[in-house]
Design a protein with these regions (language model features):
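Acidic catalytic motifs of isoprenoid enzymes
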Residues: 1-221
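Amphipathic alpha-helical protein-interaction segments enriched in hydrophobic
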Residues: 223-226
C-alpha cells in the first residue's frame, strides 16, 4: 500500500498481481512518461475492479463508482481511502494538463457495464458496440497521445480505430467468460449466423479497424512508433 502522498513513480513500482494486468509502462515508453502511464492505468484498473470484481450488488458498484468520480473531480490531492490511486493521478493531471473528461468517460463505461449486466441488456448492432468503445477504449488512446503531445484530428481518429479494434477483439475472445456473467458483447442483429461464421466476420471488421489506425505509428515519436 502506498502512502497518502504517493508519487507517480511509486505507482509504477507496484508489483503487478492482477490477472488481467499487462506491462503498461514498458520499455517502449520513454522514461519520463512511464510514471504518468502507470498512474492512468492504476486509475482504470481500480475502477474496473469496482465494476467487475467481487460480489457487490449493482447498486453498491454504482455507488462506489460515484465516489470514485468525486475523487477524480476533486481539485486537491486525495486524502481518502483511494489516496494511493488519486494522489499520483492528480499530480499527473496537473503536470500534463491531462483532460479529466477522458478519465470520466472511462467511469461512464464502467457504469454502463454494471447497468447492462444487472439488466441483462444486449447491444442491438455493431454501431452500438462501437459507441460503447468510445467510452471504454478510445479515451485510453487519446490520453496516451496527449502525453506524447500528439493532438491532431487525424491522429486521434486513427487512435480511436485501434482502440476500438482492441476492445472488440477483447470482447470476442472472452465470450466464454462474459456470457455466463450476464455480459453480451455480440451485435444482436447478426446472431442469426452460426457462431464461428459470426466471430470470423466480426474479427474481420476489427482487423479492418486496426489497419485504418495502423499509420498512427508514423506519428508517435520514439520506440512507441516506427
Amino acid at each position: 500500500m502506498l502512502t497518502k502522498q504517493a508519487k507517480p513513480q511509486e505507482v509504477q513500482a507496484l508489483p503487478i498481481t492482477h490477472p488481467e494486468n499487462f506491462p503498461v509502462a514498458s520499455i517502449l515508453c520513454p522514461p519520463h512518461l512511464r510514471p504518468a502511464i502507470a498512474a492512468i492505468y492504476a486509475f482504470a484498473r481500480a475502477a474496473d475492479d469496482i465494476a467487475d470484481e467481487g460480489h457487490l450488488s449493482a447498486e453498491e458498484r454504482l455507488k462506489s463508482l460515484t465516489a470514485f468520480r468525486h475523487e477524480l473531480l476533486a481539485t486537491t490531492e486525495s486524502s481518502g481511502a483511494q489516496a494511493d490511486i488519486f494522489s499520483p493521478l492528480h499530480q499527473v493531471i496537473e503536470q500534463f494538463t491531462l483532460p479529466v473528461s477522458l478519465l470520466d468517460d472511462l467511469l461512464k463505461a464502467f457504469e454502463q457495464d454494471v447497468k447492462a449486466t444487472a439488466q441483462g441488456a444486449t447491444y442491438p448492432n455493431l454501431s452500438a458496440l462501437l459507441s460503447y468503445c468510445q467510452l471504454s477504449a478510445n479515451p485510453v488512446g487519446r490520453l496516451l497521445l496527449h502525453l506524447y503531445g500528439v493532438n491532431d484530428a487525424q491522429a486521434l481518429q486513427k487512435s480511436d480505430a485501434i482502440c476500438s479494434a482492441l476492445q472488440l477483439i477483447n470482447f470476442w475472445q472472452d465470450l466464454s467468460e462474459d456470457i455466463p456473467r450476464g455480459r453480451f458483447y455480440l451485435p444482436q442483429d447478426q446472431t442469426q449466423q452460426e457462431t464461428p461464421l459470426l466471430i470470423e466476420a466480426l474479427c474481420a471488421h476489427a482487423h479492418q479497424l486496426m489497419m485504418q489506425g495502423a499509420p498512427l505509428v508514423h506519428q508517435v515519436p520514439g520506440r512507441a512508433g516506427w
